[in-house]
Amino acid sequence: MKNEMSLAFASVSENEAFARVAVASFITQLDPTMDELTEIKTVVSEAVTNSIIHGYHNEPHHKVYIECVLQDDEIEITIRDEGVGIKDIDEAREPLYTSKPELERSGMGFTIIENFMDSVEVISAPEKGTSVYMTKQLSKSKTVYN
């Protein structure tokens, strides 16, 4: 069965938690393991934070967009912004690279996303924004309920 949802929300850091919980709630219908659920929540958090901090420079009057598609046991998540874009995607995906070195704990977002997801594609153009496409195949083992 295929199911999908879309969200759009203001580019404020408080909405990162909302995005994480919304996607996690949506994917629970596939009965992911706790590890899978945690990984999905983490990648959503990282990608949304990248959009807010790097794409929009913490300016709150913009939108972050999420699309989530469930097909059988596969999850497809797209997180998109219309911000400043990424000049060099390969460089941005290098561990510890950040365009904001003054921020604590910067530079691991794409590395974390790539480690938790099966595939990650980043499409970006300067001054046009960035889209991060991610997929993950869930394990076939399901939760046992008492």
Swiss-Prot record:
Pfam families: HATPase_c_2. GO terms for molecular function: ATP binding; protein serine kinase activity; protein serine/threonine kinase activity; sigma factor antagonist activity. GO terms for biological process: asexual sporulation; negative regulation of sporulation resulting in formation of a cellular spore; sporulation resulting in formation of a cellular spore. Gene3D superfamilies: Histidine kinase-like ATPase, C-terminal domain (3.30.565.10). Keywords: ATP-binding, Kinase, Nucleotide-binding, Serine/threonine-protein kinase, Sporulation, Transferase. Its EC number is 2.7.11.1. It catalyses: L-seryl-[protein] + ATP = O-phospho-L-seryl-[protein] + ADP + H(+); L-threonyl-[protein] + ATP = O-phospho-L-threonyl-[protein] + ADP + H(+). Binds to sigma F and blocks its ability to form an RNA polymerase holoenzyme (E-sigma F). Phosphorylates SpoIIAA on a serine residue. This phosphorylation may enable SpoIIAA to act as an anti-anti-sigma factor that counteracts SpoIIAB and thus releases sigma F from inhibition. Belongs to the anti-sigma-factor family. This is Anti-sigma F factor. It comes from Oceanobacillus iheyensis (strain DSM 14371 / CIP 107618 / JCM 11309 / KCTC 3954 / HTE831). The lineage of its organism: Bacteria, Bacillati, Bacillota, Bacilli, Bacillales.
